[in-house]
Structure formats: structure tokens, C-alpha cells
Amino acid sequence: MTTRIAMWSGPRNISTAMMRAWENRSDCAVLDEPFYGFYLQRTGLDHPGAEEVIASQENHWQAIVEKCLGIPAESKRVFYQKHMTLHLLEEIDRAWLPELNNCFLIREPEAVISSYSAVRANVSIADIGFVQQVELYDAVADMTGDTPLVIDSKEFLKRTEAHLRAWCDRLGIPFEATMLTWPAGARDTDG
């Protein structure tokens, strides 16, 4: 049985580092921002590398959902998915979300905006994903009847191993020490 983890974040929230931790497990496949190409195609926003992203990713949300619910690469038993809440446009049906272990990664708004504005000239509230994250959290809680896991990135960085151990325990999977370190640089799995 596959444990599917959907980490819902906004930009500049250590989401890539979190994905690296899971990717370094022996039993885990990762999926990096699968809705990004669809989001760019639908919104027409001018993001760096937008044409390349649109060309390299699936652009039909139904096919993306199927991939998220499907068998991960190499039939790994853990399937970690890094999602940006702002990429989950309103037209995308949410009925599939209860089939995932939904988690939410947060960071202090001031730190997010400061970090994001260093790489993007114009920043809007929609670019950050705060509103979408709250709406999605509420939707997941309503659909599942459970309280989704929320991880504060600042607190996570203070006690990384303890947080990862508790998270693995919550998911019913063993912790792997390989989650604590990984090689620097880009990976083939980068979206």
C-alpha cells in the first residue's frame, strides 16, 4: 500500500528542503509542484521559465490528479508530493484530496514576503498563497473530519529530527536517518 503525502505550501517556506528530506528516503518517490504548468497555462502569469514549465508538465488537471493518486516511480511505498496552494485553481475538483495525507507547511508572513520580494519585483497576496492555504486547510478538514498536520517551518528547523520522527510516526512509517542530510544541487525530480 502506498502512503501518499501532499505537502501544501506557499513559496519561500522551505518546501524544497522538506521535499529533499523525503526524497532521500530509500522507499520514497517525490513529485514537485505537479500543478505548476497547468497554473501557468491557465493564468498566463509571467514567471521565469514559464514556457519551459508548461511544455514539460501535464496541462490537464484531471491527468495531474490521476498522477497524484497513481503508483509512484519505481513503485515506492511512500509518495511525497510538494504542492503550492496557489496552483490549485478553483476549477480543480477537490474530491480526490481525502485520498492523501494532507499536510500544511507555514512560515511567518513577513519572512515569506521579504524572501519572495527578493526574487520577484511585484508581489500580490495571490502570489503568496496564504488565502488559498487557509481555504484548502478548511476544505481538507471538512472532507476528512480530521485535523490536518500543520508544520511551522521555523519550529521545524529548530528540531528537525524530532519533527520528522513524529511525522513518520503519525503516518505509520519508520523514520530514516537519511532524511536529515542530502547532497547539494539540482535533481532530476525538480519540477
Feature annotation, model-predicted:
Residues 1-5, 178-191:
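PAPS-dependent sulfotransferases, especially Golgi type II membrane carbohydrate sulfotransferases
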Residues 30-32, 80, 104:
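Hydrophobic residues in well-ordered beta-strands that form the structural core
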Residues 38-40, 112, 185:
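Generic structural signal for helix capping and beta-alpha/helix-loop junctions
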Residues 45-49, 166, 190-191:
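Short, surface-exposed amphipathic charged segments that create phosphate/polyanion-binding patches used
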Residues 1-74:
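PAPS-dependent sulfotransferase catalytic core
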Residues 67-91:
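Glycine-rich phosphate-binding loop used to anchor ATP phosphates in small-molecule kinases
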Residues 4-6, 77-80, 147-148:
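Residue-level preference for the first positions of well-ordered beta-strands
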Residues 84-181, 189:
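PAPS-dependent sulfotransferase catalytic domain
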